Amino acid sequence: KLKADCPNIKTTNDNIDAAANADIVIVAVKPWLIEEILNPLRLKRTQILVSLAAGICFDDLAHFCGEPEMPIFRVIPNTAIAERASMTLISARNASDKQKKLLTDIFNEMGLTMIIPESKIAAATALTSCGIAYVLKYVQAAMQAGIEMGIAPKDAMKMVAQSLEGAAELLLNKETHPSVEID
């Protein structure tokens, strides 16, 4: 389907072939597969590596590639990326401002991005990726309260979800603290 929509794109099932002449190599695999995938690619210093493998640090990524000076990005989206509403975290090593802007522009197409230091990735992931689950637990509890008060489940979900979206828009658009909006 991609080939039909974008006839100039080259597709292959061979990772080595795919990476050989790519400007940007995006690796989106489970963390335990990253070394097995990266080692045979023989990436060049001029290429940009983008890893979506959670928990794999820059030093390990550089070691697996054999190119410690190449630009490397760690990118952590959340599940809302499926709705183009992700809060995506980006950390960069050996990357120029132009390369950072490029990656930010790409992932801004699927939500919002924030460039943060690698040292903050774990904490930020708890807020953004695990945050989705926390928010959905709140939605589930609020829905249940509405249902117990006689509101139809479908209506309760819509009410809570829209209230949540409204609260998010208030915070994002006004850039205020939640306590300001509560009062």
Predicted regions located by residue number:
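A generic structural signal for alpha->beta connector loops
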Residues: N8-I9, T46, E69, M110
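Phosphate/pyrophosphate- and phosphate-bearing ligand-binding catalytic cores of soluble enzymes
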Residues: T128
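Internal alpha-helical scaffold of NAD(P)-dependent oxidoreductase catalytic cores
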Residues: D60-P71, M87-A124, Y134-E175
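C-terminal binding/interaction regions
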Residues: D183
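Rossmann-like NAD(P)(H) cofactor-binding subdomain of soluble oxidoreductases
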Residues: D14-I90
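Short acidic-hydrophobic, aromatic-tinged amphipathic segments that line or gate anion-handling sites
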Residues: K10-N15, M114-I116
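NAD(P)-binding Rossmann-fold cofactor-contacting core
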Residues: K1-D5
